[in-house]
Amino acid sequence: MVYGTQGGEVQPQTQTSVATRVVDFGLNVQEAIDAPRVLYGRSWGDTSNKLLLESAAPEATFDALREQGHPVEPAQWPFPRMGTAQAIRLPGPWSPFFEGGADPRGEGIALGF
């Protein structure tokens, strides 16, 4: 799989979430890119560390984080500050086809021919 994202401080978090969803949870690349993301830290001029979770995440996820003492804040989905990822996955035992994915948080599109 080749993939990347723009997004400054959020790049490692976005790349990790996409890779984990493909490798560990078996999502295709578009599903992995589309899924709600989390952003922790100080980003894009914030004055303090924040834990942002896109609002498309289940409410139970917000509740569980709050119960553990995390001051999580909802971020509108799609939230461009979460980075805009693109990916291509080569054929393998999981699929005989190439897979492409583009982030709905940006202006890309995945096309095949």
Task: Please provide the spans of the model-predicted regions.
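Proteins synthesized as precursors that undergo proteolytic processing into mature forms
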Residues: 1-76
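Cofactor-centric catalytic regions
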Residues: 53-113
